[in-house]
Curated annotation (Swiss-Prot):
PROSITE patterns: RECA_1, RECA_2, RECA_3. Pfam families: RecA, RecA_C. It comes from the Bacteria. ATP binds at G61, P62, E63, S64, S65, G66, K67, T68. The keyword DNA repair applies. InterPro entries: AAA+_ATPase (IPR003593), DNA_recomb/repair_RecA (IPR013765), DNA_recomb/repair_RecA_CS (IPR020584), P-loop_NTPase (IPR027417), RecA-like_C (IPR049261), RecA-like_N (IPR049428), RecA_ATP-bd (IPR020588), RecA_C_sf (IPR023400). This is Protein RecA. Its main location: cytoplasm. Keywords: ATP-binding, Cytoplasm, DNA damage, DNA recombination, DNA repair, DNA-binding, Nucleotide-binding, SOS response. It comes from Mycoplasma mobile (strain ATCC 43663 / 163K / NCTC 11711). The gene is recA. It is found in: Cytoplasm.
């Protein structure tokens, strides 16, 4: 029986190529590689300390909620590790200066501003098959307009064209990603379902295919504004992991996005350090190693911004504590 199975496997491999079929235990590269999102809070909520390589990720939410900011931070992290990233700007709205402020090396970022949805997704497929690109960001699904719609008149209604386009493209792209270990992040918007009286009236453009093929789906929402004096300097946002094939879903992350600077990593470190009792609070005063270091959270953030050695020391302790198995009982 064992010999028969071995012969069958050899026959299939001979016909369809090496590794077309195998025993699960013989597959050495099944362990998913991870890269940081650039946010300590999001890394922790994902349960795997970052985004997986070779998978599709959807980041969706209302306008100005921080979707593109999260994607740009992911690009910066890939580039820091020596990887190559591409940005498919279907909305034709990328801000090079903002990307640079977030740590993106714009000189090494591949940019495409396609004319149609077909062109955009074909470029994604070619880049993925090349095995030379580590991360591709598509901004956004809603802007992937099918050629049949572009070539038609304003009065024409083309039902389901974008959904069919996405379904066909994702079937091709998914197979390429597994071999190349390229990650694709699709940024998506939110639409209201017409005539919905019960249940969630919100939906995302592009049909059901993207929901199905995505290994991770993040719902990004603005919670409140952040003010410095009388000036609004940023937003507090909530990220909910609504789908996660690699860890437990439905976890939430909260972070602060500072205008022109992106995710405040110092704010994240302070919140985690306080929750983990690395930094303790007595009234308005903050203590570290039983020493009074700052009065008020804003002063603590200013201190860590100026004192890189102290910030690095606290951050190292936070990351170490988060890696422990009992961290969920602490937070």
């Amino acid at each position: 029986m064992e010999k028969e199975i071995k012969n069958i496997l050899m026959e299939i491999e001979k016909k369809f190529g090496k590794e077309s079929i195998m025993l699960l235990g013989s597959k050495q590269d099944l362990n998913v590689e991870i890269f940081s999102t650039g946010s300590l809070a999001i890394d922790h909520a994902l349960g795997i300390n970052g985004f997986p390589k070779g998978r599709i990720i959807e980041i969706y939410g209302p306008e100005s909620s921080g979707k593109t900011t999260i994607a740009l931070h992911a690009i910066a992290e890939i580039q820091k590790s020596g990887g190559v990233a591409a940005f498919i700007d279907a909305e034709h709205s990328i801000d090079p200066n903002y990307a640079k402020n977030l740590g993106v090396n714009i000189d090494n970022l591949i940019l495409s501003q396609p004319d149609s949805g077909e062109q955009a997704l074909e470029i994604v497929d070619i880049l993925a098959k090349s095995s030379s690109i580590d991360l591709i960001v598509v901004d956004s699904v809603a802007a992937l307009v099918p050629e049949v719609e572009l070539n038609g008149e304003m009065k024409d209604q083309v039902m389901g064209a974008q959904a069919r386009l996405m379904s066909k493209a994702l079937r091709k792209i998914t197979g390429s990603l597994n071999k190349s270990k390229t990650t694709v992040i699709f940024i998506n918007q939110i639409r209201e379902k017409i005539g919905t009286f019960f249940g969630n009236p919100e939906t995302t453009p592009g049909g059901r295919a993207l929901k199905f093929y995505s290994s991770i789906r993040l719902d990004v929402r603005k919670v409140s504004s952040v003010s410095t004096g009388e000036v609004i300097s940023g937003n507090n946002i909530k990220i909910k992991v609504v789908k996660n094939k690699l860890s437990a879903p439905f976890k939430e992350a909260f972070t602060e996005i500072v205008f022109s600077k992106g995710i405040s990593k110092i704010s994240e470190a302070v919140e985690f350090a306080e929750n983990l009792k690395i930094i303790t609070r007595k009234g308005a005063w903050f203590y570290y190693n039983d020493q009074n270091i700052a009065q008020g959270k804003s002063n603590l953030k200013d201190l860590l911004e100026k004192n890189e050695a102290l910030y690095s020391e606290i951050l190292t302790k936070v990351i170490s504590a988060l890696s422990k198995e009992n961290v969920n009982s602490i937070l």
